[in-house]
Swiss-Prot record:
Family in the record: Belongs to the LovG family.
Deletion phenotype: Does not alter fusarin C production.
UniProt enzyme class: hydrolase
Entry annotation: catalytic residues: 105, 159, 187
Induction: Expressed under high amounts of nitrogen via regulation by GLN1. Moreover, components of the fungal-specific velvet complex VEL1, VEL2 and LAE1 act also as positive regulators of expression. Finally, expression is induced under acidic conditions in a PACC-independent manner.
Gene Ontology BP term (one): secondary metabolite biosynthetic process
Name of the featured protein: Esterase FUS5
General function of this protein: Esterase; part of the gene cluster that mediates the biosynthesis of the mycotoxin fusarin C. Within the cluster, FUS1, FUS2, FUS8 and FUS9 are sufficient for fusarin production. The other FUS cluster members are not essential for fusarin C biosynthesis.
EC nos: 3.1.2.-
GO MF, one example: hydrolase activity
Cellular-component GO terms for this entry: cytoplasm; nucleus
Keywords of the record: Hydrolase
Length: 233
């Protein structure tokens, strides 16, 4: 049996893995022959996020990766961010391998953080790439360097968070592969079948690029064998 590469999907703040599966249903169908999408639930309880109500009123409870509580002390905020990174890394090590990570809104911040962790000190053998949908900024790692792993950026031209999506794009070095798709829409997944197929094609292309990069760089890097469990599909 041929196993499809897995893509980890991280939902937006105040949403859920179930909501993201609905939002990504067209993209999941377009990618089904090549990839298996795995949807992870955020670690913290949350109020419904932007655009969640009223359509997803019956899809609670809602969760997030970090809270938007402005009363948190800096050390409390940093603890939340560290916990989110550790939570995602633990899941990836237990249920990997994963070929890439797809993040929507706050989930894009989480995705960027995991890519930066992999650059800083590789925690997995996987050749990761990231896909940012309507991404917000910044990552959960303060004063982080640019992301040098391959990335895809999906930007809504009327998204109120467009500037943050552009900041995230600027945070990815031009020396690496970074592909950009813009669509006429706001802070949501593109609904056009043509745009969805284009995104699927670019994700597949970026996956192949990341695999070639893995082969070319494999002699440079020593990665500890720390994966504890692989989940068979």
């Amino acid at each position: 049996m041929v196993h499809r590469p897995r893509l980890l999907c991280l939902h937006g703040g105040g949403a859920s893995s179930q909501i993201m599966r609905v939002q990504f249903s067209k993209l999941e169908s377009a990618l089904r022959k090549t990839f298996q999408l795995v949807f992870l639930e955020g670690p913290l309880d949350s109020a419904p996020g932007p655009g969640v109500l009223p359509f997803f009123e019956d899809f609670g409870p809602y969760s997030c990766w970090v809270s938007d509580d402005k009363s948190l002390l800096p050390e409390e905020k940093r603890k939340e961010e560290n916990n989110a990174i550790a939570y995602i890394k633990t899941f990836m090590l237990q249920y990997g391998p994963f070929a890439g990570i797809l993040g929507f809104s706050q989930g894009a911040r989480a995705t960027a953080s995991i890519l930066l962790e992999q650059q800083r000190e590789a925690f997995t053998h996987d050749a990761l790439f990231g896909v940012f949908f309507c991404g917000t900024f910044p990552p959960f790692i303060p004063d982080a360097p640019d992301i040098s792993l391959p990335t895809v950026h999906i930007l809504g031209l009327t998204d109120p968070y467009l500037r943050e999506s552009e900041e995230l794009l600027e945070h990815c070095t031009q020396q690496s592969v970074r592909r950009v798709i813009k669509f006429n829409g706001g802070h949501h997944m593109p609904t056009s079948s043509d745009v969805t197929q284009k995104i699927a094609d670019v994700i597949t292309m970026t996956y192949r690029t990341s695999q070639r990069k893995k082969v070319s760089n494999i002699w440079r890097k020593k990665v500890p064998d720390c994966r504890s469990l692989a989940l068979e599909s």
